[in-house]
Amino acid sequence: MPGFKRILTVTVLALCLPTPGNAQQQCTNGFDLDRSSGQCLDVDECRTIPEACRGDMMCVNQNGGYLCIPRTNPVYRGPYSNPYSNPYSASYPAAAPPLSAPNYPTISRPLICRFGYQMDESNQCVDVDECATDSHQCNPTQICINTEGGYTCSCTDGYWLLEGQCLDIDECRYGYCQQLCANVPGSYSCTCNPGFTLNEDGRSCQDVNECATENPCVQTCVNTYGSFICRCDPGYELEDDGVHCSDMDECSFSEFLCQHECVNQPGTYFCSCPAGYILLDDNRSCQDINECEHRNHTCILQQTCYNLQGGFKCIDPIRCEEPYLRISDNRCMCPAENPGCRDQPFTILYRDMDVVSGRSVPADIFQMQATTRYPGAYYIFQIKSGNDGREFYMRQTGPISATLVMTRPIKGPRDIQLDLEMITVNTVINFRGSSVIRLRIYVSQYPF
């Protein structure tokens, strides 16, 4: 029939053999004695033997045995022939009818082996290895597994049976691997991402501590899950390669990091001060050293040491020019009885002061006022000389006082001498006179 395989049903004769010494009968393998009829009946091994066929094989009962065939193979059963209609087949010569006292031969082994077995040279029924003899019907994609009295068609690990074919199982679809999975025919392999190593179970991945094994960083290595990062010591910054560290030039970040000068060093920096200053505890600010107070100056005995920001000045004693007379260490007076003093200021008072270079403006830097106020008198304040650059002006702040104002920033070092004149006018007694403060201004080199 088209589409079917004809499976030959083997008819096996069941011989009822008397047991020597008594009249009890015995059947060959694959048959059981029916005591009611005295006949040998076929044993259905497919029902009595647990898992007679394994895998995707189907058990087909045969007379005196059974057959394991693929489930996909259709079976056509031929006409059943009763083995008991003629207890002796044509293949076996008919035995002579027994006499009244037959002499039965002693039979220790069956003469016929059931299906799936064959008789060896010692008349023993041994299993037929269908897999070794290539007498199985397994598909080329399957493997043959021999069983007692038959065989089973199965698939190797990594394959499953689908419509009679062994198809590869894609283990990667089922998450067998923790990270990377590569499917191969009949198997799979797990791998790990960079920074991980495969554990002994072949599936899970463990982080690699690169800092402990390689220490790829120049300075500090910090392990992370699956990787690592490099860090630099204070004063260094990480380069673009993520491994090396280069010195950080802190001085380039801001011009206000140090009050005077910032000196960069590998991994750090420090502030320095110019001569005449010391660095304060904040390590950035500079403070003037008072050389005069600490007697760290070069002035001679006749000179006066005047401390400046960042230095000092050795001031000579004042010299009063004719017709002036020196009346103190810092004052010259022109006597009223001297005719040459008529148009001259009555007194010249010497004063010294210092300002830092580039001081912000406008700035009130000096105060001037009359010591005595006369009835009917008023006062005029002005810069008599020394203001050629128009960097100062006098602002009268009251009837008898005025303030010297610096209007432009002055860059040092520089020495300036201004004659500040106070004119006294008294209309009651028709008097007009003046006095001068000779102000010497020392501008330091630095703005601190």
From Swiss-Prot:
Location (main, coarse): secreted
Motif Cell attachment site, chain ranges: 54-56
Stretches assigned to the EGF-like domain: 42-82, 127-167, 168-206, 207-246, 247-287, 288-333
Subcellular location: Secreted; Secreted, Extracellular space, Extracellular matrix
Region (Interaction with LOXL1): 245-448
CDD domains found in the cross-reference section: EGF_CA
Keyword Cytoplasm: no
Pfam short name (any one): Fibulin_C
Gene3D superfamilies: Laminin
Cellular component, GO, one term: collagen-containing extracellular matrix
Glycosylation site residues: 283, 296
Disulphide bond pairs: 46-59, 53-68, 131-144, 138-153, 155-166, 172-181, 177-190, 192-205, 211-221, 217-230, 232-245, 251-262, 258-271, 273-286, 292-305, 299-314, 320-332
Matching InterPro entries: cEGF (IPR026823), EGF-like_Ca-bd_dom (IPR001881), EGF-like_dom (IPR000742), EGF-type_Asp/Asn_hydroxyl_site (IPR000152), EGF_Ca-bd_CS (IPR018097), Fibulin_C (IPR055088), Growth_fac_rcpt_cys_sf (IPR009030), Nephronectin_domain (IPR052235)
Domain of life: Eukaryota
GO biological process, one term: cell adhesion
Modification(s) after translation: N-glycosylated.
GO MF annotation list: calcium ion binding; integrin binding; protein homodimerization activity
Keyword Repeat carried by entry: yes
Keywords linked to the UniProt accession: Calcium, Cell adhesion, Disulfide bond, EGF-like domain, Extracellular matrix, Glycoprotein, Repeat, Secreted, Signal
Signal peptide interval: 1-23
Protein family membership: Belongs to the fibulin family.
Protein task: Essential for elastic fiber formation, is involved in the assembly of continuous elastin (ELN) polymer and promotes the interaction of microfibrils and ELN. Stabilizes and organizes elastic fibers in the skin, lung and vasculature. Promotes adhesion of endothelial cells through interaction of integrins and the RGD motif. Vascular ligand for integrin receptors which may play a role in vascular development and remodeling. May act as an adapter that mediates the interaction between FBN1 and ELN.
The protein's assembly and partners: Homodimer. Monomer, homodimerizes in presence of Ca(2+). Interacts with ELN. Interacts (via N-terminus) with the integrins ITGAV/ITGB3, ITGAV/ITGB5 and ITGA9/ITGB1. Interacts with FBN1 (via N-terminal domain). Forms a ternary complex with ELN and FBN1. Interacts with EFEMP2 with moderate affinity. Interacts with LOXL1.
The protein's name in its UniProt record: Fibulin-5
